[in-house]
Amino acid sequence: VVATLAWTWFMLSQTPDVEARLHAELDAVLGGRLPTLADVPRLVYARAIIDEVLRLYPPVPFLSREAGKDEEFQGQPIPKGSVIVVAPWLLHRHKKLWEQPDHFIPERFLPGGAGAPSKFAYVPFSIGPRICAGMAFGQTESILCLAILAQSFRLRLKPGTNVQPICRMTLRPGDALPMTAEPRTVVAAAPGAAVAAFAPAC
């Protein structure tokens, strides 16, 4: 979650249009109050941002599995005991699988968007029986943390900072990500007013 949020703040600092759309959703859904678990299904753009960050910067960029029996893949024998490497970093950026794979486009994960071309093309938490047990918790925590902070602040990358991915157990933006928190004005709902669900235009 920590690495995912770090990448999220970095990407938001580079894409003011995405940041503005996120703030519009937070103001519409929350109206100045703190988010709760019940708000998560309505924070659809916040979820799309997290999903897109996980596509570009999967927590574990390379996965390894051991073949439990002799197999064959496209004519290539895979003996039992072979170590098979799966690279989410490459899958998530493959131009045959994704449109504009190197661009940060959260809209692809909105309802009605292109989404993942297949369940095997988007595996930030692995897939199958070895999928990360904390996937749902991690996604929910990321959305709530993003909503809490982004509602009150804009984070700006320190000028001149060169951000390079490094992998130390998880993929992170270097050893440090110096940013400045700028307070923002929250559009609060009137007392007792109902806040309409945010419906992003695709």
Locate the predicted segments by residue:
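Cytochrome P450 catalytic-core helices
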Residues: 1-25, 135-153
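Conserved cytochrome P450 K-helix/beta-meander segment immediately N-terminal to the heme-binding cysteine loop
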Residues: 20, 40, 70, 86-114, ...
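Beta-strand segments within the central parallel beta-sheet cores of soluble alpha/beta enzyme folds
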Residues: 21-27, 65, 103
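Conserved cytochrome P450 K-helix E-x-x-R motif and the immediately C-terminal K′/meander segment
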Residues: 32-74
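Cytochrome P450 heme-thiolate "Cys pocket" and heme-binding signature region
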Residues: 34-41, 62, 74-76, 93, ...
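C-terminal domain-closing interface element
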Residues: 46-62, 174-202
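Active-site proximal loops enriched in glycine and acidic residues that flank catalytic Cys/His/Asp
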Residues: 65, 87-89, 108, 126-127, ...
